Amino acid sequence: MATIKVDVVSAEEQIFSGEAKFVALPGETGELGILPGHTPLITRIRPGAVRIEVEGGSDEFVFVAGGILEVQPGAVTVLADTAIRGKDLDAAKAEEARKRAEETLQNAKSDLDLAKAQSELATAMAQLEAIQRLAKIRSRH
């Protein structure tokens, strides 16, 4: 089967680089699925899980806290604000971040504080959802 080159990069490091049969991720207007030969595309990414189906049928998961997606016929590049490998996701840390964001939301004194708290809450909730999805997939294997 044909493959496509996939790179997932955050400001801190390269998270994934390799060939894939399929990539699924949360685009700005909904879930995107990308196969080799996809039409060129640039879009924003919402916080959530990137699923990379590699050769052999296994999946790699990366949590992204937003960013930009560039698709070319032979390559997919994810430039993430923050990215965490699926195996490195920590439910306790994500839950703590959710609680902190909710507290900040309650005590926001300005529109800027409110917007920041809303963004942090959305990221924490997306991370918790990604952890749950990954746990379900792992329990099937």
Swiss-Prot record:
<dbReference type="Pfam" id="PF02823">
    <property type="entry name" value="ATP-synt_DE_N"/>
</dbReference>
<comment type="subunit">
    <text>F-type ATPases have 2 components, CF(1) - the catalytic core - and CF(0) - the membrane proton channel. CF(1) has five subunits: alpha(3), beta(3), gamma(1), delta(1), epsilon(1). CF(0) has three main subunits: a, b and c.</text>
</comment>
<keyword id="KW-0066">ATP synthesis</keyword>
<dbReference type="InterPro" id="IPR020546">
    <property type="entry name" value="ATP_synth_F1_dsu/esu_N"/>
</dbReference>
<keyword id="KW-0813">Transport</keyword>
<dbReference type="GO" id="GO:0045259">
    <property type="term" value="C:proton-transporting ATP synthase complex"/>
</dbReference>
<keyword id="KW-0472">Membrane</keyword>
<keyword id="KW-0406">Ion transport</keyword>
<dbReference type="InterPro" id="IPR001469">
    <property type="entry name" value="ATP_synth_F1_dsu/esu"/>
</dbReference>
<dbReference type="InterPro" id="IPR036794">
    <property type="entry name" value="ATP_F1_dsu/esu_C_sf"/>
</dbReference>
<dbReference type="InterPro" id="IPR036771">
    <property type="entry name" value="ATPsynth_dsu/esu_N"/>
</dbReference>
<dbReference type="Pfam" id="PF00401">
    <property type="entry name" value="ATP-synt_DE"/>
</dbReference>
<protein>
    <recommendedName>
        <fullName>ATP synthase epsilon chain</fullName>
    </recommendedName>
</protein>
<keyword id="KW-1003">Cell membrane</keyword>
<keyword id="KW-0139">CF(1)</keyword>
<dbReference type="GO" id="GO:0005524">
    <property type="term" value="F:ATP binding"/>
</dbReference>
<comment type="similarity">
    <text>Belongs to the ATPase epsilon chain family.</text>
</comment>
<dbReference type="GO" id="GO:0005886">
    <property type="term" value="C:plasma membrane"/>
</dbReference>
<keyword id="KW-0375">Hydrogen ion transport</keyword>
<dbReference type="InterPro" id="IPR020547">
    <property type="entry name" value="ATP_synth_F1_esu_C"/>
</dbReference>
<comment type="function">
    <text>Produces ATP from ADP in the presence of a proton gradient across the membrane.</text>
</comment>
<dbReference type="GO" id="GO:0046933">
    <property type="term" value="F:proton-transporting ATP synthase activity, rotational mechanism"/>
</dbReference>
<keyword id="KW-0997">Cell inner membrane</keyword>
